[in-house]
């Protein structure tokens, strides 16, 4: 067991945030490939890497609770598919990142409904602030919302459900969970790819797909390293840095600049996430003190 080191935990979580935003950007690079092809290839690479990591860490390849691991894998797979659907040529990387960040709010709501957890007042307020931010990003006009926006929001929703299931899998290795999730994604995507037919891949496509899978595996690895140095209650808020990285990546590599309405919505979403983090931590402290 490592000695607690918050600074190292924060550092590795910032590395993870950069990798997550890079993964989203790489998904956009190959926008012309079908969603299921991107999911299949990237998951295949990530599954191979995570399988090797499991062997290196002497962790099992199959989780003990197959029902929960199946739920986590299904929700994670749906989130990935929707994330790639949102990653079109014209949709902003920053918006994809922000909408996927709604996972923390949806995880909070899922924990209340499924795990029967109690929400602190600040967390209730954070939900309303988050949905105000979501409305600014979605910006429905005349009852119409962009398909990419709905896909990004759906990705956040299913990711939130997946993270809630992971909390029930606390006795399982994170490497095993991720290997099962990636393997499930490969198997689930294959029938769709076979029906659509495989697209011819050049060196660029092969390189980007391998890099995407490697970045995903690295993100999962560094996430585990970060939480081995410090508990999530102390450092998880730094995951919101991925939105800043996505914003910068969008400007530098895609020449994208969100308008002030989307930026305002993003600020509300990030603010809601930070409020949720602080309120949840304070509620935990009070509960521990009462006990």
Predicted regions and their residues:
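C-terminal transmembrane-helix exit sites in multi-pass transporters
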Residues: 57-58, 103-125, 244-263
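Hydrophobic/small/kink-forming positions within alpha-helical transmembrane segments
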Residues: 17, 21, 25, 51, ...
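Membrane-interface helix-cap regions at the ends of transmembrane helices
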Residues: 2-3, 46-65, 75, 130-144, ...
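Loop-to-transmembrane-helix transition segments
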Residues: 7-16, 55-84, 146-157, 193, ...
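Glycine-/small-residue-enriched transmembrane alpha-helix faces in small-molecule transporters
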Residues: 1-37, 143-168, 285-291
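Helix-helix packing/entry segments at the starts of transmembrane helices
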Residues: 96-102, 169-184, 220-252
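C-terminal-most transmembrane helix of multi-pass membrane proteins
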Residues: 2, 42, 240, 244-291
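Hydrophobic transmembrane alpha-helices of multi-pass small-molecule transport proteins
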Residues: 122-138, 155, 261-280
């Amino acid at each position: 067991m490592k000695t607690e080191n918050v600074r190292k935990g924060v550092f590795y979580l910032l590395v993870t945030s950069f990798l997550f935003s890079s993964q989203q950007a790489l998904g956009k690079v190959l926008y012309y490939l079908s969603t299921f092809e991107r999911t299949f290839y990237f998951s295949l690479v990530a599954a191979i890497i995570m399988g090797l990591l499991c062997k290196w860490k002497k962790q099992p390849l199959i989780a003990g609770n197959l029902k929960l691991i199946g739920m986590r894998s299904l929700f994670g797979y749906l989130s990935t598919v929707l994330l790639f659907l949102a990653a079109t040529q014209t949709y902003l990387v920053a918006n994809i990142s922000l909408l996927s960040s709604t996972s923390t709010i949806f995880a909070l709501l899922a924990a209340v409904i499924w795990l029967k957890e109690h929400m602190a007042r600040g967390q209730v307020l954070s939900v309303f602030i988050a949905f105000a931010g979501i409305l600014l990003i979605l910006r429905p006009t005349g009852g119409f919302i962009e398909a990419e926006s709905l896909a990004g929001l759906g990705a956040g929703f299913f990711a939130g459900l997946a993270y809630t299931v992971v909390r029930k899998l606390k006795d399982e290795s994170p490497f095993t969970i991720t290997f099962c999730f990636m393997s499930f994604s490969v198997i689930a995507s294959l029938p769709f790819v076979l029906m659509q037919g495989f697209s011819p891949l050049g060196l660029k496509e092969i390189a980007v797909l391998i890099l995407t899978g490697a970045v995903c595996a690295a993100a999962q690895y560094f996430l585990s390293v970060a939480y081995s140095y410090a508990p999530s209650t102390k450092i998880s808020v730094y995951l919101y840095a991925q939105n800043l990285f996505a914003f910068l990546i969008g400007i530098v590599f895609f020449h994208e600049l969100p308008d002030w309405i989307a930026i305002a919505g993003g600020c509300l979403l990030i603010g809601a996430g930070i409020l949720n983090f602080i309120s949840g931590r304070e509620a935990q402290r009070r509960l521990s003190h009462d006990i």
